[in-house]
């Protein structure tokens, strides 16, 4: 689950992570009123959407007067902001964050992530702040420093200090940077985050260490113990199909292609998408029905896939372990009849009760194209979509 920058900064502020003063606003008039509450002559007007790259896309403006605050607010509110993370359709700006300006001395990057190679939380930092960390990693990886954190001990002060020295935090600010990083680690752990990222972290002319941005992602599996975080969810920022999928415990992520995919298991889903790409197709989604799919679940999965107007065909790739192929087959037949599917459909079944499942599909009388392997299924659906 993601939240807005202003919400992330409220969490930071409540847990001892230093941030500039700021206020959220939903209208241009409110933006001016909120700016008046700040003790500043310079204001930063920030579009609030669930996407990075806002600055490059024109979503962050520096205002030197209240009239400029109003001008920028009118310019941004209601705008479709297009960044490298939104896709070409962009996202509508419905709220702004009005923040006091800072005397920035230097910008840095800091973030806590879970390193899958070590299975531990890792602190990443760089003195190349204000730019995409992916670019830094690709072009100058030597400028990224890491500290692997022992989960029993937590982030040690000496690790935080070492990072501060490595990224050339001014000596007079190292103490504040150390305190900042320790507090930030506490946010990551206490709030069950999957990512906490600040880009940029800045040092100021008067020696402060501040978070000018706040990106927090939360582990969905831990939200049951964070009712306060759940209340911050902005459904308007999420794909309606992903919201609908979550109601049925389906993992759905929309993509840009035209071949709908229904698979059980994240690994098989990724392999399926790679195979479709290999044979010249483009997946329209990642959809994992999980290990306990029922007829109802399969039907809802079809409805969600077909909710994407770009879908021109569907590939169902199921390996029945816990899940039985005959149950999936019954669900597919019921779903095809209910949604009155007219698009090409290729189904590959393997595993428990596979022969019974194949028989159900064959005897249904429906236009379902069988496939013996994942590669054969991918080739068939790519061909059918191109011929359609």
Curated annotation (Swiss-Prot):
Biological role stated in the UniProt entry: Succinyl-CoA synthetase functions in the citric acid cycle (TCA), coupling the hydrolysis of succinyl-CoA to the synthesis of either ATP or GTP and thus represents the only step of substrate-level phosphorylation in the TCA. The beta subunit provides nucleotide specificity of the enzyme and binds the substrate succinate, while the binding sites for coenzyme A and phosphate are found in the alpha subunit.
Binding annotation for substrate: 264, 321-323
Keywords, alphabetical: ATP-binding, Ligase, Magnesium, Metal-binding, Nucleotide-binding, Tricarboxylic acid cycle
Pathway: Carbohydrate metabolism; tricarboxylic acid cycle; succinate from succinyl-CoA (ligase route): step 1/1
The protein's required cofactors: Mg(2+)
Cofactor notes: Binds 1 Mg(2+) ion per subunit.
Pfam families for this protein: ATP-grasp_2, Ligase_CoA
Binding site for ATP: 46, 53-55, 99, 102, 107
Catalytic activity: succinate + ATP + CoA = succinyl-CoA + ADP + phosphate; GTP + succinate + CoA = succinyl-CoA + GDP + phosphate
One GO term (biological process): tricarboxylic acid cycle
Subunit comment: Heterotetramer of two alpha and two beta subunits.
Protein name: Succinate--CoA ligase [ADP-forming] subunit beta
Gene Ontology CC terms, in alphabetical order: cytosol; succinate-CoA ligase complex
Domain of life: Bacteria
HAMAP family reported for this sequence: Succ_CoA_beta
Binding annotation for Mg(2+): 199, 213
Family: Belongs to the succinate/malate CoA ligase beta subunit family.
EC number: 6.2.1.5
Provenance organism: Staphylococcus epidermidis (strain ATCC 35984 / DSM 28319 / BCRC 17069 / CCUG 31568 / BM 3577 / RP62A)
Gene Ontology terms, MF aspect: ATP binding; magnesium ion binding; succinate-CoA ligase (ADP-forming) activity; succinate-CoA ligase (GDP-forming) activity
Broad enzyme group: ligase
ATP-grasp domain sequence ranges: 9-244
């Amino acid at each position: 689950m993601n939240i807005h920058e202003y919400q992330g900064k409220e969490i930071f502020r409540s847990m001892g992570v230093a941030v500039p003063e700021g206020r959220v606003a939903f209208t241009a008039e409110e933006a001016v009123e909120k700016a008046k509450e700040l003790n500043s002559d310079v204001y930063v007007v920030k579009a609030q959407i669930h996407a990075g790259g806002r600055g490059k896309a024109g979503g962050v403006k520096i205002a030197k007067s209240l009239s400029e605050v109003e001008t920028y607010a009118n310019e941004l509110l209601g705008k479709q902001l297009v960044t490298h993370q939104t896709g070409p359709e962009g996202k509508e700006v419905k709220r702004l964050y009005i923040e006091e300006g800072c005397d920035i001395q230097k910008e840095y990057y800091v973030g806590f992530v879970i390193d899958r190679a070590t299975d531990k939380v890792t602190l990443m930092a760089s003195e190349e702040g204000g730019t995409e960390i992916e670019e830094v990693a690709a072009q100058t990886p030597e400028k990224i420093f890491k500290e692997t954190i022992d989960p029993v001990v937590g982030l040690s002060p000496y690790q935080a200090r070492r990072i501060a020295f490595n990224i050339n935090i001014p000596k007079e600010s190292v103490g504040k940077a150390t305190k900042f990083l320790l507090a930030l680690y506490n946010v990551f752990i206490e709030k069950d985050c999957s990512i906490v990222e600040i880009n940029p972290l800045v040092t100021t002319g008067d020696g402060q260490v501040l978070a000018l941005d706040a990106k927090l992602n939360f582990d969905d599996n831990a939200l049951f113990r964070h009712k306060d975080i759940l209340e911050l969810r902005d459904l308007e920022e999420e794909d309606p199909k992903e919201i609908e999928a979550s109601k049925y415990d389906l993992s759905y992520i929309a993509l840009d292609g035209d071949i709908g995919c229904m698979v059980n298991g994240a690994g098989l889903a990724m392999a399926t998408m790679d195979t479709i790409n290999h044979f010249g197709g483009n997946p329209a989604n990642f959809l994992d029905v999980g290990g306990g799919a029922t007829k109802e679940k399969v039907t809802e999965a079809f409805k969600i896939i077909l909710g994407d107007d770009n879908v021109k065909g569907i590939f169902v790739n199921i390996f029945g372990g816990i899940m039985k192929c005959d149950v999936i087959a019954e669900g597919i037949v019921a779903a095809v009849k209910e949604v009155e599917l007219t698009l090409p459909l290729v189904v590959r079944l393997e595993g428990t009760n596979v022969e019974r499942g194949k028989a159900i599909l064959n005897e249904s009388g429906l236009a379902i194209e069988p496939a013996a392997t994942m590669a054969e299924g991918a080739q068939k659906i790519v061909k059918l979509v191109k011929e359609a």
